[in-house]
Amino acid sequence: MNSSFHLHFLDLGLNATEGNLSGLSVRNASSPCEDMGIAVEVFLALGLISLLENILVIGAIVRNRNLHIPMYFFVGSLAVADMLVSLSNFWETITIYLLTNKHLVMADASVRHLDNVFDSMICISVVASMCSLLAIAVDRYVTIFCRLRYQRIMTGRRSGAIIAGIWAFCTSCGTVFIVYYESTYVVVCLIAMFLTMLLLMASLYTHMFLLARTHVRRIAALPGHSSVRQRTGVKGAITLAMLLGVFIICWAPFFLHLILMISCPQNLYCSCFMSHFNMYLILIMCNSVIDPLIYAFRSQEMRKTFKEIVCFQGFRTPCRFPSTY
Protein backbone atom coordinates (compact mmCIF):
# COMPACT_ATOMS: atom_id res chain seq x y z
CA MET A 1 0.00 0.00 0.00
CA ASN A 2 1.10 3.56 -0.42
CA SER A 3 3.18 5.13 2.28
CA SER A 4 0.50 7.52 3.49
CA PHE A 5 -1.79 4.59 4.25
CA HIS A 6 1.08 2.81 5.93
CA LEU A 7 1.61 5.78 8.21
CA HIS A 8 -2.09 5.73 9.10
CA PHE A 9 -1.64 2.05 9.94
CA LEU A 10 1.15 3.03 12.32
CA ASP A 11 -1.20 5.49 13.97
CA LEU A 12 -3.69 2.65 14.38
CA GLY A 13 -1.03 0.59 16.15
CA LEU A 14 -0.02 -1.66 13.30
CA ASN A 15 3.60 -2.46 12.49
CA ALA A 16 5.25 -2.59 9.10
CA THR A 17 5.98 -6.02 7.71
CA GLU A 18 9.35 -6.60 6.14
CA GLY A 19 8.03 -8.11 2.97
CA ASN A 20 5.34 -5.53 2.24
CA LEU A 21 6.08 -4.08 -1.16
CA SER A 22 4.76 -0.62 -0.59
CA GLY A 23 4.51 -0.34 3.15
CA LEU A 24 8.22 -0.33 3.68
CA SER A 25 9.01 3.31 3.38
CA VAL A 26 11.39 3.72 6.23
CA ARG A 27 10.90 6.66 8.54
CA ASN A 28 13.98 8.03 10.10
CA ALA A 29 13.64 10.77 12.68
CA SER A 30 16.95 12.29 11.65
CA SER A 31 16.15 12.22 7.94
CA PRO A 32 16.09 15.67 6.35
CA CYS A 33 13.28 14.54 4.04
CA GLU A 34 9.60 14.42 4.78
CA ASP A 35 6.84 12.42 3.18
CA MET A 36 5.47 14.20 0.12
CA GLY A 37 1.81 14.80 0.75
CA ILE A 38 -0.37 14.24 -2.31
CA ALA A 39 -4.07 15.03 -2.24
CA VAL A 40 -6.44 12.09 -2.27
CA GLU A 41 -8.24 13.73 -5.19
CA VAL A 42 -5.12 13.30 -7.36
CA PHE A 43 -5.11 9.51 -6.83
CA LEU A 44 -8.85 9.32 -7.45
CA ALA A 45 -8.71 11.47 -10.59
CA LEU A 46 -5.80 9.55 -12.14
CA GLY A 47 -7.38 6.22 -11.24
CA LEU A 48 -10.71 7.18 -12.79
CA ILE A 49 -9.15 8.65 -15.96
CA SER A 50 -6.94 5.60 -16.44
CA LEU A 51 -9.86 3.25 -15.85
CA LEU A 52 -12.05 4.98 -18.43
CA GLU A 53 -9.22 5.23 -20.98
CA ASN A 54 -8.30 1.57 -20.76
CA ILE A 55 -11.93 0.48 -20.89
CA LEU A 56 -12.13 2.53 -24.10
CA VAL A 57 -9.05 0.73 -25.47
CA ILE A 58 -10.48 -2.70 -24.70
CA GLY A 59 -13.85 -1.68 -26.13
CA ALA A 60 -12.20 -0.47 -29.33
CA ILE A 61 -10.33 -3.75 -29.78
CA VAL A 62 -13.51 -5.76 -29.21
CA ARG A 63 -15.60 -3.54 -31.50
CA ASN A 64 -13.30 -3.16 -34.52
CA ARG A 65 -12.59 -6.37 -36.43
CA ASN A 66 -9.59 -4.74 -38.07
CA LEU A 67 -7.98 -4.74 -34.62
CA HIS A 68 -8.52 -8.48 -34.16
CA ILE A 69 -4.86 -9.26 -34.75
CA PRO A 70 -2.23 -10.61 -32.33
CA MET A 71 -0.52 -7.27 -31.68
CA TYR A 72 -3.76 -5.63 -30.55
CA PHE A 73 -4.70 -8.67 -28.49
CA PHE A 74 -1.43 -8.14 -26.62
CA VAL A 75 -2.18 -4.41 -26.40
CA GLY A 76 -5.52 -5.37 -24.86
CA SER A 77 -3.66 -7.49 -22.30
CA LEU A 78 -1.47 -4.48 -21.50
CA ALA A 79 -4.59 -2.32 -21.13
CA VAL A 80 -6.07 -4.82 -18.66
CA ALA A 81 -2.82 -4.66 -16.65
CA ASP A 82 -2.98 -0.85 -16.64
CA MET A 83 -6.61 -1.02 -15.59
CA LEU A 84 -5.75 -3.38 -12.74
CA VAL A 85 -3.15 -1.05 -11.22
CA SER A 86 -5.59 1.86 -11.56
CA LEU A 87 -8.31 -0.12 -9.80
CA SER A 88 -5.87 -1.09 -7.06
CA ASN A 89 -4.82 2.48 -6.32
CA PHE A 90 -8.35 3.81 -6.76
CA TRP A 91 -9.91 1.42 -4.25
CA GLU A 92 -6.92 1.74 -1.95
CA THR A 93 -7.37 5.51 -1.82
CA ILE A 94 -11.07 5.13 -1.05
CA THR A 95 -10.22 2.63 1.70
CA ILE A 96 -7.67 5.07 3.14
CA TYR A 97 -10.31 7.78 3.30
CA LEU A 98 -12.94 5.53 4.90
CA LEU A 99 -10.56 4.15 7.54
CA THR A 100 -8.89 7.42 8.51
CA ASN A 101 -12.23 9.23 8.79
CA LYS A 102 -13.74 6.39 10.84
CA HIS A 103 -16.41 5.67 8.21
CA LEU A 104 -15.15 2.09 8.06
CA VAL A 105 -14.02 -0.04 10.99
CA MET A 106 -12.00 -3.18 10.35
CA ALA A 107 -10.01 -5.57 12.50
CA ASP A 108 -6.23 -5.34 12.26
CA ALA A 109 -6.03 -8.74 10.58
CA SER A 110 -8.61 -7.73 7.97
CA VAL A 111 -6.81 -4.47 7.24
CA ARG A 112 -3.51 -6.29 6.83
CA HIS A 113 -5.13 -8.84 4.52
CA LEU A 114 -6.67 -6.04 2.45
CA ASP A 115 -3.25 -4.39 2.27
CA ASN A 116 -1.81 -7.63 0.88
CA VAL A 117 -4.59 -7.87 -1.71
CA PHE A 118 -3.89 -4.36 -3.00
CA ASP A 119 -0.15 -5.05 -3.14
CA SER A 120 -0.84 -8.34 -4.91
CA MET A 121 -2.85 -6.48 -7.55
CA ILE A 122 0.11 -4.16 -8.16
CA CYS A 123 2.40 -7.21 -8.39
CA ILE A 124 0.09 -8.89 -10.91
CA SER A 125 -0.17 -5.66 -12.89
CA VAL A 126 3.57 -5.05 -13.23
CA VAL A 127 4.28 -8.68 -14.18
CA ALA A 128 1.42 -8.64 -16.71
CA SER A 129 2.71 -5.36 -18.17
CA MET A 130 6.22 -6.75 -18.56
CA CYS A 131 5.00 -9.98 -20.15
CA SER A 132 2.59 -8.16 -22.48
CA LEU A 133 5.32 -5.75 -23.63
CA LEU A 134 7.60 -8.71 -24.28
CA ALA A 135 4.84 -10.46 -26.24
CA ILE A 136 4.32 -7.33 -28.37
CA ALA A 137 8.07 -7.16 -28.98
CA VAL A 138 8.17 -10.78 -30.17
CA ASP A 139 5.13 -10.15 -32.38
CA ARG A 140 6.84 -7.13 -33.98
CA TYR A 141 10.00 -9.16 -34.47
CA VAL A 142 8.09 -11.89 -36.29
CA THR A 143 6.23 -9.27 -38.35
CA ILE A 144 9.45 -7.68 -39.57
CA PHE A 145 11.67 -10.70 -40.10
CA CYS A 146 9.23 -13.54 -40.78
CA ARG A 147 6.70 -11.58 -42.80
CA LEU A 148 5.76 -14.39 -45.20
CA ARG A 149 5.23 -16.87 -42.36
CA TYR A 150 3.63 -14.43 -39.91
CA GLN A 151 0.06 -15.66 -40.45
CA ARG A 152 1.12 -19.24 -39.70
CA ILE A 153 3.30 -18.36 -36.72
CA MET A 154 1.10 -15.81 -34.91
CA THR A 155 -2.35 -17.34 -35.19
CA GLY A 156 -5.30 -16.13 -33.16
CA ARG A 157 -5.36 -19.36 -31.18
CA ARG A 158 -1.65 -19.14 -30.42
CA SER A 159 -1.86 -15.50 -29.32
CA GLY A 160 -4.83 -16.38 -27.11
CA ALA A 161 -2.82 -19.18 -25.52
CA ILE A 162 0.07 -16.77 -24.91
CA ILE A 163 -2.24 -14.25 -23.21
CA ALA A 164 -3.82 -17.00 -21.10
CA GLY A 165 -0.34 -18.17 -20.09
CA ILE A 166 0.68 -14.61 -19.20
CA TRP A 167 -2.27 -14.09 -16.87
CA ALA A 168 -1.98 -17.54 -15.32
CA PHE A 169 1.65 -16.77 -14.53
CA CYS A 170 0.78 -13.30 -13.19
CA THR A 171 -2.00 -14.66 -10.99
CA SER A 172 0.42 -17.24 -9.60
CA CYS A 173 2.89 -14.45 -8.83
CA GLY A 174 0.18 -12.51 -7.03
CA THR A 175 -0.82 -15.58 -5.02
CA VAL A 176 2.79 -16.26 -4.06
CA PHE A 177 3.12 -12.65 -2.96
CA ILE A 178 0.13 -12.94 -0.60
CA VAL A 179 1.36 -16.24 0.86
CA TYR A 180 4.99 -15.16 1.29
CA TYR A 181 4.53 -11.41 1.76
CA GLU A 182 6.83 -11.38 4.81
CA SER A 183 9.77 -12.71 2.82
CA THR A 184 12.19 -10.33 1.13
CA TYR A 185 12.78 -13.03 -1.50
CA VAL A 186 9.45 -12.06 -3.07
CA VAL A 187 10.68 -8.50 -3.54
CA VAL A 188 14.04 -9.74 -4.85
CA CYS A 189 12.28 -11.96 -7.41
CA LEU A 190 10.13 -9.05 -8.58
CA ILE A 191 13.21 -6.84 -9.00
CA ALA A 192 15.03 -9.64 -10.83
CA MET A 193 12.09 -10.08 -13.22
CA PHE A 194 12.07 -6.35 -13.98
CA LEU A 195 15.81 -6.24 -14.70
CA THR A 196 15.64 -9.45 -16.76
CA MET A 197 12.79 -8.01 -18.82
CA LEU A 198 14.80 -4.85 -19.49
CA LEU A 199 17.79 -6.92 -20.59
CA LEU A 200 15.68 -9.11 -22.90
CA MET A 201 13.91 -6.13 -24.42
CA ALA A 202 17.15 -4.21 -24.93
CA SER A 203 18.76 -7.23 -26.62
CA LEU A 204 15.71 -7.86 -28.80
CA TYR A 205 15.44 -4.22 -29.82
CA THR A 206 19.11 -3.89 -30.63
CA HIS A 207 18.92 -7.00 -32.80
CA MET A 208 15.62 -5.91 -34.34
CA PHE A 209 16.65 -2.43 -35.44
CA LEU A 210 20.12 -3.44 -36.61
CA LEU A 211 18.70 -6.14 -38.85
CA ALA A 212 15.71 -4.06 -39.89
CA ARG A 213 17.88 -1.58 -41.75
CA THR A 214 19.51 -4.31 -43.83
CA HIS A 215 16.24 -6.17 -44.26
CA VAL A 216 14.32 -3.13 -45.49
CA ARG A 217 17.00 -2.27 -48.05
CA ARG A 218 17.14 -5.84 -49.32
CA ILE A 219 13.37 -6.16 -49.75
CA ALA A 220 13.01 -2.66 -51.21
CA ALA A 221 15.49 -3.68 -53.94
CA LEU A 222 13.21 -6.49 -55.13
CA PRO A 223 11.23 -5.61 -58.29
CA GLY A 224 7.56 -4.87 -57.78
CA HIS A 225 7.79 -5.19 -54.03
CA SER A 226 5.36 -3.32 -51.86
CA SER A 227 6.78 -2.38 -48.51
CA VAL A 228 3.48 -1.41 -46.87
CA ARG A 229 3.48 -4.38 -44.49
CA GLN A 230 7.15 -3.85 -43.78
CA ARG A 231 6.55 -0.20 -42.85
CA THR A 232 3.61 -1.30 -40.70
CA GLY A 233 5.85 -3.70 -38.80
CA VAL A 234 8.48 -1.02 -38.23
CA LYS A 235 5.80 1.45 -37.13
CA GLY A 236 4.50 -1.11 -34.65
CA ALA A 237 8.03 -1.58 -33.31
CA ILE A 238 8.37 2.18 -32.83
CA THR A 239 5.04 2.24 -30.97
CA LEU A 240 6.34 -0.52 -28.73
CA ALA A 241 9.52 1.47 -28.11
CA MET A 242 7.39 4.39 -26.92
CA LEU A 243 5.35 2.12 -24.64
CA LEU A 244 8.49 0.54 -23.24
CA GLY A 245 10.14 3.92 -22.65
CA VAL A 246 7.13 5.23 -20.74
CA PHE A 247 6.95 1.99 -18.75
CA ILE A 248 10.60 2.24 -17.69
CA ILE A 249 10.36 5.93 -16.77
CA CYS A 250 7.20 5.44 -14.71
CA TRP A 251 8.10 2.17 -12.97
CA ALA A 252 11.86 2.60 -12.44
CA PRO A 253 11.51 4.80 -9.29
CA PHE A 254 9.22 2.17 -7.75
CA PHE A 255 11.76 -0.60 -8.35
CA LEU A 256 14.59 1.61 -7.13
CA HIS A 257 12.52 2.09 -3.98
CA LEU A 258 12.36 -1.70 -3.58
CA ILE A 259 16.11 -2.06 -4.14
CA LEU A 260 16.92 0.61 -1.55
CA MET A 261 14.37 -0.87 0.83
CA ILE A 262 16.36 -4.12 0.83
CA SER A 263 19.91 -2.83 0.52
CA CYS A 264 20.07 0.30 2.69
CA PRO A 265 16.88 0.86 4.70
CA GLN A 266 18.66 2.82 7.46
CA ASN A 267 20.76 5.07 5.23
CA LEU A 268 19.63 8.71 5.34
CA TYR A 269 19.83 9.19 1.58
CA CYS A 270 17.97 5.96 0.91
CA SER A 271 15.38 6.93 3.50
CA CYS A 272 15.02 10.31 1.81
CA PHE A 273 14.36 8.69 -1.57
CA MET A 274 11.88 6.23 -0.07
CA SER A 275 10.00 9.02 1.71
CA HIS A 276 8.58 10.09 -1.66
CA PHE A 277 6.84 6.77 -2.33
CA ASN A 278 3.50 8.45 -3.04
CA MET A 279 5.10 10.26 -5.97
CA TYR A 280 6.26 6.92 -7.38
CA LEU A 281 2.70 5.62 -7.16
CA ILE A 282 1.56 8.70 -9.07
CA LEU A 283 4.11 7.90 -11.80
CA ILE A 284 2.80 4.32 -11.99
CA MET A 285 -0.74 5.62 -12.45
CA CYS A 286 0.50 8.12 -15.05
CA ASN A 287 1.84 5.16 -17.03
CA SER A 288 -1.68 3.74 -17.15
CA VAL A 289 -2.99 7.12 -18.34
CA ILE A 290 -0.31 7.67 -21.00
CA ASP A 291 -0.45 4.23 -22.66
CA PRO A 292 -3.93 4.71 -24.22
CA LEU A 293 -2.81 8.11 -25.55
CA ILE A 294 0.10 6.39 -27.30
CA TYR A 295 -2.29 3.86 -28.88
CA ALA A 296 -4.49 6.69 -30.15
CA PHE A 297 -1.57 8.77 -31.40
CA ARG A 298 0.13 5.90 -33.24
CA SER A 299 -2.87 3.99 -34.62
CA GLN A 300 -5.30 5.64 -37.02
CA GLU A 301 -7.60 2.60 -36.80
CA MET A 302 -7.68 2.80 -33.01
CA ARG A 303 -8.30 6.54 -33.15
CA LYS A 304 -11.19 6.07 -35.56
CA THR A 305 -12.79 3.48 -33.29
CA PHE A 306 -12.38 5.77 -30.27
CA LYS A 307 -14.32 8.45 -32.17
CA GLU A 308 -17.09 6.00 -33.01
CA ILE A 309 -17.44 4.84 -29.41
CA VAL A 310 -17.28 8.29 -27.80
CA CYS A 311 -19.28 10.26 -30.35
CA PHE A 312 -21.91 7.82 -31.54
CA GLN A 313 -22.25 5.40 -28.64
CA GLY A 314 -21.77 7.91 -25.86
CA PHE A 315 -23.52 11.05 -27.11
CA ARG A 316 -25.47 9.64 -30.07
CA THR A 317 -24.39 12.67 -32.11
CA PRO A 318 -21.62 12.83 -34.67
CA CYS A 319 -18.56 14.87 -33.80
CA ARG A 320 -15.32 15.67 -35.54
CA PHE A 321 -11.74 15.44 -34.36
CA PRO A 322 -8.74 16.82 -36.19
CA SER A 323 -6.82 14.04 -37.94
CA THR A 324 -3.06 13.93 -38.09
CA TYR A 325 -3.08 11.39 -40.94
UniProtKB/Swiss-Prot annotation:
SMART domains from the UniProt entry: 7TM_GPCR_Srsx
Spans within the Cytoplasmic topological domain: 62-73, 139-155, 212-239, 298-325
Transmembrane intervals: 38-61, 74-97, 115-138, 156-179, 187-211, 240-265, 274-297
Keyword list, A-Z: Cell membrane, G-protein coupled receptor, Glycoprotein, Lipoprotein, Membrane, Palmitate, Receptor, Transducer, Transmembrane, Transmembrane helix
Residues carrying covalently attached carbohydrate according to the record: N2, N15, N20, N28
Membrane topology recorded in Swiss-Prot or TrEMBL: Multi-pass membrane protein
Lipid tethering residues (S-palmitoyl cysteine): C311
Extracellular face of the membrane: 1-37, 98-114, 180-186, 266-273
Location of this chain's protein in the cell: Cell membrane
GO CC field: plasma membrane
Family annotation (Pfam families): 7tm_1
A GO molecular function held by the record: melanocortin receptor activity
Function, in words: Receptor for MSH (alpha, beta and gamma) and ACTH. The activity of this receptor is mediated by G proteins which activate adenylate cyclase. This receptor is a possible mediator of the immunomodulation properties of melanocortins.
Family: Belongs to the G-protein coupled receptor 1 family.
Name of the featured protein: Melanocortin receptor 5
Organism annotation: Ovis aries (Sheep)
